């Protein structure tokens, strides 16, 4: 058992018989009163996301997560297919459980698969990925390099704010934790 104050983004815990993953967590201290933990949590069986508030002293059951190296192969309907790099077994993970992470997946990408009791519950991505710009507006004459930027749609459908000099077909390094542009590849 651990206290909710010790929970961090990405941790998996059990509460009321449900496997839950912390997507986002904030410590909230109202003007008067005790600190509260505001969290966005995902039910790993249904894929639903709920915003909840808990007291820091509440205890939850931490779940042991097995991690295995894998490779993303392809999309099949509403699931992504991965291959375990040691056993060569293939696993499917529903896009609902992947959430926004599906926008960073490119074929043959190496990832970490997370398992609880033999069931796949999620994917850990590398901190950065290389994606190709599928569509963006052409550079506007007179725009400066350090200007406000413009939206660019990547090959996976992810929309990223990029500098004005970026054009269609450019390969970019994208941060997977916040979806921001880092540099050209």
UniProtKB/Swiss-Prot annotation:
InterPro entries for the chain: Elong-fact-P_C, NA-bd_OB-fold, Rib_uL2_dom2, Transl_elong_fac_P/YeiP, Transl_elong_KOW-like, Transl_elong_P/YeiP_cen, Transl_elong_P/YeiP_CS, Transl_elongation_fac_P
Annotated compartments: Cytoplasm
Any single biological process term in GO: peptide biosynthetic process
UniProt GO MF annotations: translation elongation factor activity
Top-level taxon of origin: Bacteria
Keywords: Cytoplasm, Elongation factor, Protein biosynthesis
Family affiliation: Belongs to the elongation factor P family.
Annotated protein name in UniProt: Elongation factor P
Native source organism of the sequence: Limosilactobacillus reuteri (strain DSM 20016)
Lineage, uppermost ranks: Bacteria, Bacillati, Bacillota, Bacilli, Lactobacillales
Gene giving rise to this polypeptide: efp
């Amino acid at each position: 058992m651990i206290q909710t104050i010790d929970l961090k983004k990405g941790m998996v815990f059990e509460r009321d018989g449900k496997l839950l993953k912390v997507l986002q967590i904030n410590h909230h201290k109202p003007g008067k009163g005790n600190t509260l933990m505001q969290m966005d949590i995902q039910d790993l069986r249904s894929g639903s996301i709920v915003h909840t508030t808990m007291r820091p002293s509440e205890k939850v059951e931490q779940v042991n997560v097995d991690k295995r190296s894998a490779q993303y192969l392809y999309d099949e309907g509403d699931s992504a297919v991965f291959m375990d790099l040691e056993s060569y077994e293939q696993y499917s993970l529903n896009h609902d459980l992947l959430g926004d992470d599906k926008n960073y997946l490119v074929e043959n990408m190496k990832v970490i698969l997370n398992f609880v009791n033999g069931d796949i519950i999620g994917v850990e991505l590398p901190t950065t990925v290389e994606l190709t710009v599928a569509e963006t507006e052409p550079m506007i004459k007179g725009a400066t390099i350090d200007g406000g930027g413009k939206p660019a749609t990547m090959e996976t459908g992810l929309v990223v704010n990029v500098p004005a000099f970026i054009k269609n077909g450019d390969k970019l390094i994208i941060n997977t934790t916040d979806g921001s542009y880092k540099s050209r590849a």
